[in-house]
Amino acid sequence: MSEVFILYMYRMFWALFLGALLAMGFRRSWNAEHGKMTSWMEDREHAVVWLDPIVFPVMIIFFAAINLWVYGSDDGVEYGLCLLIDIFVFVSVYFTGLMFLLPMLRRRYTARTCAVLWLVPVFLFYQPHMLYLMRSEPPLVVLYLPGILLRVLLAVWAAGFLVLFGTKIGSHIWFSRRLRQHSRPILDPELLEIWEKVRCDLDMHIPVDLRYCSLTRTPLTIGMRKKSKVTYLPERAYGAEEAELIFSHELHHVQRRDTHTKCFLEFCKALGWIHPLVWLAARRAQDDLELSCDEIVLEKADAVTRRKYAELLLSTAGDGRGFTTCLSASARTLRYRMRATVSGGKKKLGVVMLFTVMALSVLGMGKISVSTDRTSLAELIQLSEDSLSEVYLTKDGEEIRISDLERLAGYLSSLQAERLIYTYTLLSEQGGCDLEGITSSDATFRMSGSYVEICYPEKRNPVLCRMKEPVDWQKIQAFE
């Protein structure tokens, strides 16, 4: 059994494993929210699907820092750049595709299912090193960017990311303080009784403060830390049924840690700010968060309650800034939410669909890469006419030793190649012939198909290069 086959099996196992974890996590969350507890569920107050979305930015920064510390500046920066490209490409492609499929998905599956689909990058990249340890095939698509252009684009992207995400964090902190300054505790015994009743119905023990605020026109919840969560209500009178609907909606957001999901979506927007469709997709994802809470609040409601809830959405449309969850934050989606609120209807849970999407995401990640440093193969291998020590050609399972190393070095020097920003473990055979050699500087190389794998003694990870022209294997065989 070859090493490449073992890596394929490990990758398949990892895909099925993550798919199963997502499916089970979603089912556990669904059952917890609906009071269907089992012995392995701790409580109902946490309805997060498997992983808290805040894990996504935290783990990316953590793994980039760890690799920089372990592998040093060169290998660490290359790993971080590869991880960044993989995440940017996956989030851009996945979010764009999901956005176009969303109308069909919303018709067939629950709003909760659609909301969870946006979280697939969280589960995929929570241990990115596992994806690279099991990767053995070259990318299907390679985009060439000259080194200077790549550095300029990275600088522009990094500046945009820091400005956008930094501004969002600053806006969240400022908005949170403003809300606190212009708020007061709710002392109305009837409202507090309804609040405690809804908390008891949801079996929620997370501390959430309840306050009036003169700045907001819509009920909202804010707070990134467990003990800093606050639900703010506009200063007006509330009926008992109206208050119960509002509290149920906001506390379901707290159960799901949707303020963290909002942070994750804003991080993705900043990450893919160059791609306008990522912005649009992130807004659609935020809509699904609200739709999924509407769905569970009205799950057992009659037609009269549904109409009252629709009127509530219409009367409380407002603005939600920072990492907040709002009852009715956007007039842009109000029409769809009101239609979904009034109509109701039975939809599929989609556990198998989530499993399939997760598994395919693992298998499909890393199919697109970026190449740079287009130059001669001799320069990449650090090759000169007398620097080859041993070279072997493998053809049809037969190993042939190349004796005319000077002529081979001359031919290899005439070939053009480009270096890929790509992290993997082992290069699989690309079919046809293989050429393996050692240079006098102890660097090794292996040419297979249109790719060359180079292992430098001073680097811990191999370097993958792509040939810019077909290799003349008959000519190489003539050098034996």
Role assignments for model-derived ranges:
Residues 65-66, 163-173, 382-393:
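Short, compositionally biased low-complexity segments
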Residues 20-34:
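Basic/hydrophobic alpha-helical interface regions
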Residues 18, 342-344, 453:
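Enrichment for repetitive, rod-forming helical segments
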Residues 1-3, 60-75:
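Membrane-embedded alpha-helical segments in integral membrane proteins
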Residues 2-21, 77-87:
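Hydrophobic transmembrane alpha-helical segments in integral membrane proteins
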Residues 1-6, 364-369, 454:
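Charged interaction patches that mediate protein-protein contacts
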Residues 30-58, 71-134, 140-368:
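Membrane-embedded and juxtamembrane structural elements of multi-pass membrane proteins
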Residues 371-480:
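Function-determining sites in protein domains
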